[in-house]
């Protein structure tokens, strides 16, 4: 029933059901999401993610836009890169998605398939906790994807970050483009 509620909520918010499809692992007693090993459309969550980022790139704080066709249209980025999808649980989960400027996501000096440095993982944890505490519609999804307690959620992020780092090896640090706002 909780899984169906998440899907209904996603539809009402215009978010792709692929971002909140929750399955149950009987052996490990875990809820998880998976869409085979293929990419799914994750751009439907721009507006929801912007509730925290308030028009700024998650990495460098440069102003971003949510208007389709705008030169500064935000990319929806996998914080832990898609390239680590075999090592990371539910890579398309909302817990792992952030809004990024094009330079940070795919520019010459951008993140691409590198792992954001550890201090940015703390920023992601803070962002996820914000969604959970604010009781915004994404809060239940993030709890189901990452854990019931803050310690479990932090451990989930750390485990996945380390698994991705073990595979991809290289970390990345953004250049500040604006004042830190979150």
Sequence positions of predicted segments:
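Cys/His-coordinated zinc-binding microdomains
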Residues: 61, 102-105
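Short, charged surface segments at domain edges that flank catalytic/cofactor-binding sites
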Residues: 2-63, 83-91
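Short pre-active-site segment immediately N-terminal to redox-active cysteine/selenocysteine motifs
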Residues: 56, 97-100
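Residue-identity detector for glycine
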Residues: 14, 21, 51, 55, ...
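Extended charged
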Residues: 1-34, 112-182
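Histidine-centered nuclease catalytic patch
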Residues: 61-97, 110-123
